[in-house]
Amino acid sequence: MRTENTATLNLMWGALILEELARLGVQHVCMAPGSRSTPLTLAAAQQTKLKRHLHFDERGLGFMALGLAKASCAPVAIITTSGTAVANLYPAIVEAWLTHVPLIVLSGDRPPELLGCGANQAIVQPAIFANYAQQVNLPTPDAHIAPQMLLTTLDEAVANQTRPVHINCMYREPLYPSEMSGTILDSESPYLRPLQTWLQHARPYTQYGKSEQLSSPSDDAIMRFVHGKGVIIAGTLTPEQDPQQLIALSQKIGWPLLTDAQSQLRQHPAAIGNIDQLLQHPKARNLLQEADRVLVFGGRLLSKRLIAYLAEQNWHSYWQVLPQQDRLDPSHNAKHIWHANAAQFAQLNWYRSSSANWANTLVTYNDELHSLFVRNIDQGEFGEAQVIRAIANTRPLEQQLFIGNSLPVRLYDMYAPVSCCTATTYTNRGASGIDGLLATACGIAAHQGKPTSLIIGDLSQLHDLNSFAIARSLTSPLVIIILNNDGGNIFNLLPVPNEELRSDYYRLSHGLEFGYAAAMFNLPYNQVDNLADFQSCYHEALDYQGASVIEVSVSQHQASEQIAALNLWVKQS
């Protein structure tokens, strides 16, 4: 009788956790199979408020949860069993912490008496994520512990949280109830008697007010700030921050808007998108050096040239706008940081600058680069930059674009074309790893089923082959474009002492193709080596209701040689 009560109480705690998380805004739960997490798994299986996603590999599962949280702007729960299953979430948790994405890890664990004694699949799980998650350690379920304690613990940890939380859940055996019938949270249960009111509504047990403390400058401070030559820089911004408001701000003040690949504005016709290249254009750089005021929205800039410009310029006034308290400036410039939403800050009572339109010539230089890229990329030899520009120019309404790390995101930042219709853009640029990129894109695609394109390098895809299994489950378009240049060819751009060292220790050529991997997971596959075939396959893939793979075969040195040639032309402009 006692063991059956243990199984029932375990399950009841699991159900209380999942129900309260749903009330706290969780929409998705990502689950990997395992025995010690059974109370959570069975509770999730009966929870109708959550959409369930299952995958056998915890590393990919964590990144899928990351993508779901990015796309939904809501916390996502992850259920794993004990042991190294939890450790496999670490890369995704690091990325989520650095980019303020709320993931909630629910890890099944052995009870205290089975830790540190050689029991199977038992490791020290509390604080396993070190500095990258808020830690909550729940005791083993006990009838003497009031259910209200469990709910208030969850509420305090999760409400208004913008970063990962690790909730470690210890369970004693038996884990499996003898039967699953009826509702787990039965209002007739004596244990749940203190929660009768809670059971009758759909609100969290404890309701926390929003803890936002937004800051903004006075009208007088704004007037002084805009009195001079300035630039506005759009760094990493999420779609819900409504970055379009920065266009109106730029036009009102009369300062140029310089845009990063992650700003949602990189291709906007009213922005200066080619800033990375303009900073090596002699006339443009000389003009930009006249600026003495800068207004930066967001951080984590891609362009090293833009980062260097911010570091080297002698700024009279440097303002940065961030949604949370953060330090996002590797150059450590003296500045005033305002905690605010980008759109709200852009809609303050701004005045026209006394030096409005001081940098209008940048538009001419930006247009010159556009023409240069059309001639030498779009009409040039087939390669990675040409494919990326073709993707950026071919977008259905409401498309989502996930750009992989290493070379793809840099090529987009350097050479993306101007377009009046741009996709919602996502990246993983917190830790900037090349792992979990396909899984993240699958999570983004799965949330609302919008057509999604992933641009990913060959080594990144080799890192995440398991996630083809997640892609296979999608029922909306996900086009996986693999830029296969046979290794880590971003190292062609770095000052490795000689070619032999570059080849043997950095580039790691593999000679592999992805056709059989796609076939293993029953994914439609095409391999292309020219622009016409790519465009035909890409349009077809966008109409396919599921995931498909396009492998783009390019030579090892094509991208680096093209970048070098373009750099030379820009410098000679």
Swiss-Prot record:
Binds 1 thiamine pyrophosphate per subunit. Keywords: Magnesium, Manganese, Menaquinone biosynthesis, Metal-binding, Thiamine pyrophosphate, Transferase. GO terms for biological process: menaquinone biosynthetic process. It is an enzyme of class 2 (transferase). It catalyses: isochorismate + 2-oxoglutarate + H(+) = 5-enolpyruvoyl-6-hydroxy-2-succinyl-cyclohex-3-ene-1-carboxylate + CO2. Its cofactor is Mg(2+); Mn(2+); thiamine diphosphate. Its EC number is 2.2.1.9. GO terms for molecular function: 2-succinyl-5-enolpyruvyl-6-hydroxy-3-cyclohexene-1-carboxylic-acid synthase activity; magnesium ion binding; manganese ion binding; thiamine pyrophosphate binding. It holds the Pfam family TPP_enzyme_M_2. Pathway: Quinol/quinone metabolism; 1,4-dihydroxy-2-naphthoate biosynthesis; 1,4-dihydroxy-2-naphthoate from chorismate: step 2/7; Quinol/quinone metabolism; menaquinone biosynthesis. Belongs to the TPP enzyme family. MenD subfamily. Homodimer. Catalyzes the thiamine diphosphate-dependent decarboxylation of 2-oxoglutarate and the subsequent addition of the resulting succinic semialdehyde-thiamine pyrophosphate anion to isochorismate to yield 2-succinyl-5-enolpyruvyl-6-hydroxy-3-cyclohexene-1-carboxylate (SEPHCHC). This is 2-succinyl-5-enolpyruvyl-6-hydroxy-3-cyclohexene-1-carboxylate synthase.
